[in-house]
Amino acid sequence: MKDIPTLRFRPNKSPARVMFGFPWIYSDDVILDRRTKKIPPGTFVKIQTNDKQDIGLIAFNSESKITGRIMDLDVNATIDTNWIVKKLESALALRKTLYDAPFYRLIHAEADGLPGVIIDRFGDAFVVQPNAAWADRMMPEITSALEQLFSPNIILKNASGRARSLEGLNDENIFIKGSSDAPLEVKMNDAIYMADISGGQKTGLFFDQRENHAFTAKLANGGSIIDVFSHVGGFSLAALSAGATSATAVDSSQPALDLAIKGADASGFSKSFSTYKGDAFEVMAQLFEEGERYQVVVCDPPAFAPSKPALERGLRAYEKAAKMASKLVKPGGYLVLCSCSHAADMQKFRKASLVGMGKAGRKGQIIHSGSAGIDHPVHPHLAESSYLKSIFLRLD
């Protein structure tokens, strides 16, 4: 292998956690000088202990707090299309075991061996989020690997991920192959969802909530459900497919609600499905004053605490959401609360939610806790890859 740059740990920084499996190296862990700062972002670099013992091969970016991402423990590895194909094959084998239909998260970043890379599959369409500099640089190789394995009709580079700005990357979405102006149909939990992969939120659909949708659907059988912060109707359409008598979706985005309506129509649920456009807190307050109550109330907001500085404000928002949602639950009904905030762990999120429920004068029992779907594996040394929390409560 040709000579590659070398990076070493600082004398006062232990490499132990990296040697035991932690996949990131921070800027204050290593010696950064004029030489290393000239290395282009996304370059593959050999990482060593301070006494020159090889650790592995990393993707280097001096412009990011995450200076290094472990690519391979073999310092002589060649990171190319074939290397990426092997990672995709391993990830695909797991998804084929889990799902009958080709709609899922194919690559979940470090947990699937492709640091900083998200790939969602919508049948013959693939949405790639290269959220690390190396992946952005190697999009041609990632594209080639997808072509070899899947021969897809559509490959979209989605550059909307917040992490890209932390890597010094742009936010330009590009169709690398094919195009799609119309929403794509996704069959999931016996319902049909509409995914706008080019103009919708994130990659177009939240596969991470699939199992939580299914569990909630059981609770709604024979009753009513309101899906607050609904996006394209994830919880509500699944509930209708499982026997809910009515479902209401609440969101501030009319395009998202339009997709939810199209999904309800395609699923045959149009007569039992309704929507409210507006601020979720205002809509919940209005519905409470109007005397509306539901067998199941779901509150699945965007990240109220996306970072540590936003944590306290975010927890207050989760408390408020739980308080208002609790008031809409019928006696003996169910409350489903979700958080996708990295900064708020389950303990903090649960505490804020229970305080809110208590302030609403409601009591109950936790019957289940959920996380991201099984196509979102968790890196065993990276708590950040486990971000989604869900609490299911039965209220008195």
Where are these regions (language model features)?
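Conserved SAM-binding motif I beta-strand of class I
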Residues: 246-251
